[in-house]
Structures are given as structure tokens and as C-alpha cells.
């Protein structure tokens, strides 16, 4: 505190000198002016003060009444541990140190606000803020990084505003209480998030400072939703191709240079006007979106988390707003100033000026000039002393005394009084309060749900709007989880009415993306597949009412592309479909990758089947260092004419262009065999196109069934939702219960009441054994009869009551209301159910009673206590 004290003393001395000069000048001026002027001046000052009071009274601090309240009265403290209700001696000592530190700070910095050191907890016990932090590493891998931790805290808790936006809260609850009630203010959010980040290995601190209105109220209506920001596309630099020496020179440009210059000027003027229009439109939108001036700007208290660089490979310092879970630069304008910050080891006061928000702050906590610490012996090392300062500490005795003095002043932070922070798997999965949360962004609305809360697996929906009032919808994005059809994302463009479904690997049809406007067949659609999961290597299929294009990869025949053009369907009386009445194929175009096993002049690059014109066109791959490729065209004719005569292959039926005609001359037989092979290939290609049409119909039918059922998958390890596992567990419990009842029944001693009538230790005679057996069987028989009579009595009672109710209904049927009739029908249904159950129990009892009687008789014969019976029946 020495540097702080010297600085404050210098400022006080300068203020006293300035005040003395001002008082002397005012006294001289007062003596020189007349009395009337001084009276008028006093009147003006009073009017100015009244005007100022009036303006200040108009400033109202409003707190939204819709936000939920979270006070100590709503917290059950009866089950909290003793550490929440009392302080240890070490904690009491720490509070005394904090009070002393606060008194010195208030004395040396009277213009600064009081420090936020030891607010009350939920049990009305003062606790130091550093001991409220409980560093905890969560058992979930998803919460190991700062971004997932911040997003979890933002989703899990509900924001509660500060009671007074100009002051820190009087209470700071434990993280366990905040997690239990899922509510808290910014300080509660920061405490929980900081505890999780420190437990994960980050150098994190809770900050007490000042924020903007949007930051304090969690108002994101002027923020762009992160999900709408498209990633920047990396622009690949085109490599300049060096011109070859013997390239063909381009033809001379005969266009007028003057006309070209005039056209360039005209285009520049058009671009300038368009740029001006866009700039004016942007300024107009910015003016409309501009926030209204805040009367309390710079005074609103807020708490957030500071993460310093170094640990966990953090490259630079940054802020985390716990309300939203978003990260911000330390230069961001939303953060207007810092009063203090703390972690689980120490407490620091910011001694730097925040006139330029937090942009000029240096977060070197080891610098006591910029950051005044409360406790010695922290993990932040002090700055190294300069040579001038170090020259005065050369004496070894002084160094030893200095070390002893520091040791005496050091004080270790007590352990946290908060219990271990725990998040149950159910709470971690549910995340949002009641399983749902809605966040309003600029021209966007984000809705979140817990998994399995919606029957269709919907977990998130992003709706983007055209205007700031969020009335005209542009597009909707819906994210799904645990879908049996592997649906992951559904994108709906309201402008074009285009729907796009994205799937994870594992769909029965290996779907990756399905874009469509209508689920009706033979409409515009694009279907992408996971080609590695398909036998044919199909990557993408594009369909229009008249065409179908398919892209392949990794096929053994090197097919890469197939395009089919269709003609109008022939009209029939019955309903037409792709299976019963397929569309006539007009043209099929197929392209192939290069087959290195064949020479280029024999490897087909493209073949076109002109079905309507009965022609087949072939184009082969180019040789290396060639710019043209060989081509052939076959005139496909029927093998016999109208009279049944066989047509002979003629040279005019094959038109060819050879790059090297002297190397290979194809004979007529080769051309005939090639044409026969192409006919077979054409037939096969037409069949594959027909199969593709049928596959599209099958996919559409399957997608309609999947959307109607929207079945969700449940892990075998999820015993809470897995019905099969639940049924098996209940069956095992039922079997164990029945086994327990059987064991109890076998251990039941029927002879005990009758043996108690005899003197203890007396040996039974033959006559006594027979008498005990008969009495026991007679008693058991009577119990069976009584049980049957009881069931019969209940059966007759229920039957009589039902008959009375039916008779009452017959008598009052005309005057009954519909509600009375519903009650009567409900009663009859329940009564019939009870009567049926009693009848079944009575019949079952009648069947089992003789068996139970015989089982008891056999058990008595084998009882060693009635051994005389065995001698009689031996």
C-alpha cells in the first residue's frame, strides 16, 4: 500500500493548493462586485440546483417484473452443511484482514466505491468472495474447454437482475445453491463459471466492474447470432501459367479503344452510384438499430470472467460474459471499467484509469502499481526491482529481515466453504430450465430444447427474419438428435420454399443431403449420398421433371457421370407411375474417368445414346500432348428389315474421326462387334435409369414414413428410457419378489401356535401328534374357507352396488345431463373391472385351495417334531 499512499497524498496536496487559489480568487471577486449582483447570482444558483434536481428525479431505474425473483426467502437452508452457517477461526481472521484492507482503501481513495469483499451468503453469514469459489473439474469431457463450460452455464441458469443496478449485490450465494435453483445474477453466474474454469486448468478470475446496458440486461437484440455468421472462405491464389514459346497468338483486337474507355467510365459511374446507395442504406439501418442513450451509462455494475493467457495454451487475455457464454476481447466497448477482481487465492484492486473503458488496462497482476493485492504470498510474482532500487538492499541482514517481515505478513487463503459442485447426468442432459430456452438476437430467434423433450428429437431451432421487428421469416434451421433416420439438420428457405435435410451416416438409403421443394415424384430435387456406403458409388442425384443426373465415384467401370433426358409420358387410362408407366428416355449421356489399363484411343471418355434418333456417339480420352480426341458415331438400326431380311453392317453406319488414322484402321467386323456391345450397354443403361427412378420413389416413400413416425433411438446404457431394459429389470425384480415370498412361506411355521399349548420340552405321544395334525389342518381349511367367503362377499357387494346404480340410471335417464351420463359410464366401467378381478381371484382360489391343503398335509407328515406320525403310517 506504500505506492498507493504516496500517490494519494500527492493528489490531495494538489487539490488543496487548487482549492486555496480558487477561494482567494472568489473572495477578491466578491469584494469587487456590488451586493445586487451577488444576490442575483445566489438566485440563479438556486434555480440551477432546482432544475438539476428535477432532471435527476426524472431518471428512473426500471427492473423488469417478468424476470423471476431469487431471494434468500425462497431458499431452504435447513439441509445446508455447517460450513454455510458458521465461520471457522481462519475465516474470521480473513474477514478482519479484509475489513482492515477496506478501511485503508476507503481512507486513501475516498472517491472510489466501497470494495466488494465479503457479502452475505444464503444463511446470512459474511463470506469472503475468494472462498466462495470452489475449483471443480467436472466428470464430463464436454465441460473441459472454456467455450463448452461457458455455454453450459449460460444455458443451465436463468438470469436474475441485480436489485440495484448501481451497486454489487448484498448476497452472494454458493454455486451449489445456484445450481439447485437454476437462477442467479451476474455474480452468481461468474462464480460458478470461474470455479469450473479454474478446475479445468484455466487462469480465470471473477471481475467486479461496469458494463453496458445490453450486457447487464442480457439484451442480444443488437447482436448477430453466431450461428448465422458464415465462415470466411479461403481464396486460393491462382498460379500464373507461364506462356509457352510456341503458343498461338490471339487475333488482333479490332474494338475501338475510345468506346472501351467510355464503357469503363460508364460502369464506374454505375458502381459509384450503387456504392453510394448501399452506403446510405447501411447508414439508415445503423441509425435505426442504434441504441437509445443510457442515462446510467458507465454506472451499471456487472460481473464477468477474465481468462489470462498462459495456462491451457491460451494465446491472449479475453473476457467471458457468463450470461451469454460468448467471449470478447479485452478491448471490447461493452466492458466499461473494472473495480476489482479475484480468484480462489487472492483479491486485486484495479489502480488504473478506465476513462477509455478497458482498452488501456494492462492485466499484469504482479505489478503492485497497477493492481493492489490484498494478501501476500500469492501465485503472482512481484515485478523485478530496478538497479537503483536494488542498490539499497545489499546488506544481508536487511534481506533476511525483509524476508522475515514478508513471512509474518503472509496469510494463506482458507479453503472454500462451498460443498463439492456436482451436476447430475439428468441435469447435464436437460441443460435449460424446464428443458427449454429462447434467445432473441438481431433479426434472429434461437430456441433450445433438452434431448428427448420433443417427440421428434428437435433440440434447437434458429429462425432468421428480414426485418428488425422479426415479422417476415427468411429461413428456419432445425437441429435434431437421436433420430432413427439419422436426420441431423433441416433447413427451410421461406423465400424460395426450398427444403434441405442433412443426415448423419447410417441412413438405410445412405442419404447425406436431400434438397427439395415438394415430396411429389418427378419434381426438382437434389439427393446426395455417402458413396462409401453404397455398392454403386453414387455421390449425388439431381432430378427435374424432364432430366436426371447422377454423379459416381470409385466404380470399377470408371463411370463418373450419367445424364438422362425424358420425353412426355404416353397417356393411359389408368393412373401412371414410374413403375407401371415409366417416362420415355430420349437421351442418355455417360462419362468415364481415365482407365490407365487401356490406351487413350480405346478408352471411352463420353458416350451418348440418342434413343429417339437411334444414334450412339463416342468420344475417347485425349492422348498426352494432344488437344483433340478420337470420335465415333454409330447409326443404330434394327437387325432385320420389314421383310424379315437380316441387315448387313455397312461402312456408312459408323462415322469416325481418328487422331492418328495411319496407326490403327478398324475393320468392319470390329465396328459391328462394337455396335452390338453398345446396344447391350444402352439396354443396361436404360434399365439402370429406370431403377434410379424406382429408387427415388422408394426414398420419398421412406422419408414420408420416417417423418410421420419420427422414431428416436435410445442407447442400451440409458436404463431410464430404454423400455426393453426397463421391462427386463422389472421382470427380474418381480421374480426376486416372488422368490422372497416363497421363501417366507416355506419358513412359516404352522405348528408353532399349537405346540405352544403343550408344556415346553415334553415329548409328543402318538395321540398328541395326530391331534396336533388334525387341528392344524382343520385351522388351515377354515382359513381357506374364510378367504373364499371374503372374496365372495366383496363380489356380491360390488354386484349389488352396480345393480342399484343401473336401476337408478333407468329411473332418471330422461333428466340426466351429458356430464352425469359420462360419470355413470365411467362408474360402470370401473365396477365391471372390479367385479371381473374378484371373480378371477375367487376362481383361482378355488383351484389352488385343495393343492395348498395337500401340500400342508405332506409337510406335516415330514415334520420331525411329529415323528410319531411317521411310525403310524410306516
Curated annotation (Swiss-Prot):
Coiled-coil positions: 1-67, 257-297, 688-711, 781-807
GO cellular component term, pick one: cytoskeleton
Localization per Swiss-Prot or TrEMBL: Cell projection, Cilium, Flagellum; Cytoplasm, Cytoskeleton, Cilium axoneme; Cytoplasm, Cytoskeleton, Flagellum axoneme
Any one GO BP annotation for this protein: sperm axoneme assembly
Record field: transmembrane: none
Pfam families in the cross-refs: CEPT76_peptidase, DRC7_C, MORN_DRC7
Compositionally biased region (Acidic residues): 386-400
Alphabetically ordered keywords of this record: Cell projection, Cilium, Coiled coil, Cytoplasm, Cytoskeleton, Differentiation, Flagellum, Spermatogenesis
Annotated segments matching region Disordered: 386-410
Keyword Coiled coil assigned: yes
Record's compositionally biased regions (Basic and acidic residues): 401-410
Main location: other
Family per similarity comment: Belongs to the DRC7 family.
Function: Component of the nexin-dynein regulatory complex (N-DRC) a key regulator of ciliary/flagellar motility which maintains the alignment and integrity of the distal axoneme and regulates microtubule sliding in motile axonemes. Involved in the regulation of flagellar motility. Essential for male fertility, sperm head morphogenesis and sperm flagellum formation.
PANTHER family in the cross-refs: DYNEIN REGULATORY COMPLEX SUBUNIT 7
Assembly mode: Component of the nexin-dynein regulatory complex (N-DRC). Interacts with TCTE1/DRC5. Interacts with DRC3 and GAS8/DRC4.
Protein name, entry field: Dynein regulatory complex subunit 7
